[in-house]
């Protein structure tokens, strides 16, 4: 979306003559409706201390829009950080194959087999409960450090 269209959309949603939206939900890492799968640490097994944690992708795509929305809004905006799915390395295998029609429906867009199944099922393994908690806190702190008024998790 070009910058002019982005600005108009933000005005229509958050601006004084728009919808006056005051709530934004931001997924932690990719989610089912993301254009691609991504996570803030490439290999959390090799990096259990999360030393390589980075929200650079968010800085490029998410944070600029959030900051514009906050600037445009006449009222404070509440931001909900939504943990969607832990890194795939910490999860069990999904029960349904990611290209199965039960996942996306008969018209679902196929997901290439080489893409890990981060958002397509499976459960967090108990041995990673503490790691996932640290990951979420790290994400929350990174957004607070960027000046985003996260009020809910």
Each predicted region: which residue ranges?
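N-terminal catalytic cores of secreted or lumenal carbohydrate-active enzymes
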Residues: 1-150
